[in-house]
């Protein structure tokens, strides 16, 4: 079985099979999740000093910050044909 990796920006990759959710960092609950992950040592900052645009939560409780839009990460995960934003 081959493992699929998703590019989350600047050459950083995460395992597609381990992603639970991809969300925007703007809401207060997500900001609390980021702070809790920082305090517990489970925060991975992959932004290279740029603005955080997506927060990726992994099945290992790690929280990954990315400067790529959540929609872009989702399109890379599911392919542009399989993903459609409903709202």
Swiss-Prot record:
InterPro entries given in the database record: RemA-like
Residue ranges that the Swiss-Prot or TrEMBL entry lists as coiled coil: none
PANTHER family, sorted: REGULATORY PROTEIN SSL2874-RELATED, REGULATORY PROTEIN TM_1690-RELATED
Family classification: Belongs to the RemA family.
Name of the protein described by the UniProt record: Putative regulatory protein GK1166
Organism this protein belongs to: Geobacillus kaustophilus (strain HTA426)
């Amino acid at each position: 079985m081959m493992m699929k990796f998703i590019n989350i920006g600047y050459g950083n990759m995460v395992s597609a099979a381990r992603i639970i959710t991809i969300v925007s960092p703007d809401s207060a609950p997500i900001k609390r999740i980021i702070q809790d992950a920082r305090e517990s040592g489970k925060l991975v900052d992959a932004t290279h000093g740029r603005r955080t645009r997506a927060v990726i939560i992994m099945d290992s409780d790690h929280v990954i910050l990315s400067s790529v839009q959540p929609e872009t990460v989702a399109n890379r995960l599911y392919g542009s044909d399989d993903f459609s934003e409903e709202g």
